[in-house]
Amino acid sequence: MNEAYSPAAPRPMGSTSPSTMKMFMCFLSVFMVVQTIGTVLFCLYLHMKMDKMEEVLSLNEDYIFLRKVQKCQTGEDQKSTLLDCEKVLKGFQDLQCKDRTASEELPKFEMHRGHEHPHLKSRNETSVAEEKRQPIATHLAGVKSNTTVRVLKWMTTSYAPTSSLISYHEGKLKVEKAGLYYIYSQVSFCTKAAASAPFTLYIYLYLPMEEDRLLMKGLDTHSTSTALCELQSIREGGVFELRQGDMVFVNVTDSTAVNVNPGNTYFGMFKL
């Protein structure tokens, strides 16, 4: 009995497993990252190497030029060389002239600035010392007031000292640098027979956040039998420790009686 022949079915080709593909992709990624890093490092190394080679070549060119100059000056093997000694020596002389001109211009420039280059440090120290020696002081003259005021007003005069470290604000003197200060004031005033209470001069330390502090006080009681004004003066002065930003001012019992003729009424301070 004949049986029909049927060929065997082809075996299916084996497919690549997902884990193998994943490992291959990871390996490829790592390889590319390593290659990129290596390329960057190699480029950096090559750049540094080229910079170093440029320095070496520059030094080599200088050496060759000096060697040419030496040969031309000593006459060494002039017949066996193809050097144009006249051209080489002229170039060397030009370089010397440029260097000499630059070295001469530098002292002139420094001389124009006051010989600073040899004594720059000492001059700076001298300037600082002179700044420190400049007095910190101010002296003000009185200003007439026709109404009663709590704080006497003042003005600068052409003959009196002023300092940027002592500023004036509406009758008050403000110190910009802490330290010991001598504070003084004189007030001249007129008394009449009708006046019975003493005329009092006050010098206060201004305290914005609390009550003003009395530094000095002067009194004068002078009776007169005439109705005319008789001129009197009260003067106060003392040394006080002031902080940066402290302000002082002058007050009197009757500001309308103050005489502000030149030299009669003044207010000032200076740092010790």
UniProtKB/Swiss-Prot annotation:
UniProt modification remark? The soluble form derives from the membrane form by proteolytic processing.
Q: What SMART domains does this protein's entry cite?
A: TNF
- Give the primary localization class: membrane
* Residues marked Cleavage (site): E110, M111
| BP GO terms, sorted | B cell proliferation; cell surface receptor signaling pathway; immune response; inflammatory response; platelet activation; positive regulation of canonical NF-kappaB signal transduction; positive regulation of extrinsic apoptotic signaling pathway
Task: Tell me which residues make up the THD domain.
Answer: 136-272
Q: Does the keyword Oxidoreductase apply?
A: no
- Record's superkingdom? Eukaryota
Cysteine disulfide links = C190-C229
A cellular component annotation (GO) from this entry: cell surface
Q: On the Extracellular side, which residues?
A: 45-272
Please list the residue ranges that the record places on the Cytoplasmic side of the membrane. 1-23
Q: How does it assemble?
A: Homotrimer. Interacts with CD28. CD40 ligand, soluble form: Exists as either a monomer or a homotrimer. Forms a ternary complex between CD40 and integrins for CD40-CD40LG signaling.
Tell me its family. Answer: Belongs to the tumor necrosis factor family.
Name of this protein:
CD40 ligand
Q: Specify the species.
A: Gallus gallus (Chicken)
